[in-house]
């Protein structure tokens, strides 16, 4: 099937690779412009662009799809369908209507739950028992289109955004290839009940509030791993917490209840948190024993409570 692929990050790159491996004709790839990255801030291509170039696929990197020139470039391809995955640009209705089978989107949640930009993080923060991928027929609304295929799996107690991302990307690649092989597929309208929105993650959200329960803070730490990293303040200095688990314990919120070579136990609004991996500002992620060697902490010390 002749198609256009629109996507940018690694989540989308896996889908593109799967589509190519399945033998479909990817006539054009749309992706975000190269961005400065790394210590030297040199321009870096997106993960999708790297895959496209590896396979000799033409790449188009417009700043917007609203101008006539970009729309003409897309129309000239004569694609039967456009596959979209974490692209980053709004597709105007004229673009949605161009391909014979329209545009389909690979969305990393079980719609209608967690429409929007950050479904993985929001599912973890909310304590959802499962997540998955929907292949959705796109329309003008935000992730409101009917669902063609869906797949689900349970969220483990140790899952982070990083681990869920990888599992969802793999599932999304498999489902979109299945969908392309079965078109046209019956479309299931999304129910009106159960709609939630996954707002974009803001860095300020990563700050830990010790008045919350240990279970909530465990989810918080896992949701913000790898970006931007859950943050706590200790004597005014930022410390990132990367791994922790809820344990029994009571004390003044933010107070250190116990310290050993394996963990630091910190009192929460309900229960306590056993932290096992930390990072000081400008430093590396370290297990507790190595962290304590350079940054001693003692029972009775207290993490700052955000204002």
UniProtKB/Swiss-Prot annotation:
Pfam families the record matches: Formyl_trans_C (PF02911), Formyl_trans_N (PF00551)
Binding site for (6S)-5,6,7,8-tetrahydrofolate: 109-112
Gene Ontology CC terms: cytosol
Catalysed reactions, as listed in the record: L-methionyl-tRNA(fMet) + (6R)-10-formyltetrahydrofolate = N-formyl-L-methionyl-tRNA(fMet) + (6S)-5,6,7,8-tetrahydrofolate + H(+)
Record-listed E.C. numbers: 2.1.2.9
HAMAP family named in the record: Formyl_trans
Protein name as annotated: Methionyl-tRNA formyltransferase
Organism name: Dechloromonas aromatica (strain RCB)
Gene: fmt
């Amino acid at each position: 099937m002749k198609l256009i692929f629109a996507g940018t990050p690694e989540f989308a790159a896996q889908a593109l690779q799967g589509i190519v491996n399945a033998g479909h004709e990817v006539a054009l790839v749309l992706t975000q412009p190269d961005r400065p990255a790394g210590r030297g801030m040199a321009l870096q291509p997106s993960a999708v662009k790297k895959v496209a170039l590896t396979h000799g696929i033409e790449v188009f990197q417009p700043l917007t799809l609203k101008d006539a020139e970009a729309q003409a470039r897309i129309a000239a391809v004569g694609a039967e369908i456009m596959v979209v995955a974490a692209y980053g640009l709004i597709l105007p209705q004229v673009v949605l209507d161009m391909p014979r089978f329209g545009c389909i989107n690979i969305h990393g949640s079980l719609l209608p739950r967690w429409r929007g930009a950050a479904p993985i993080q929001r599912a973890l923060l909310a304590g959802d028992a499962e997540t998955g991928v929907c292949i959705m027929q796109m329309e003008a609304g935000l992730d409101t289109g009917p669902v063609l295929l869906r797949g689900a799996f349970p969220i483990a107690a140790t899952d982070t955004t990083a681990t869920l991302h990888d599992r969802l990307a793999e599932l999304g690649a498999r489902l979109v290839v299945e969908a392309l092989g079965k078109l046209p597929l019956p479309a299931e309208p999304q129910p009106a009940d159960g709609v939630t929105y996954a707002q974009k993650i803001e860095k300020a959200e990563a700050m830990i509030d010790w008045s919350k329960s240990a279970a909530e803070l465990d989810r918080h730490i896992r949701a913000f791993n790898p970006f931007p990293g859950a943050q706590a303040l200790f004597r005014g200095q930022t410390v990132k917490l990367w791994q922790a688990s809820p344990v029994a314990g009571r004390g003044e919120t933010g107070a250190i209840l116990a310290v050993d070579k394996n963990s630091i136990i910190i009192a929460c609004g309900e229960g306590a948190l056993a932290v096992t991996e930390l990072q000081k500002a400008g430093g590396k992620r370290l297990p507790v024993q190595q962290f304590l060697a350079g940054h001693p902490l003692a029972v009775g010390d207290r993490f700052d409570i955000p204002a």
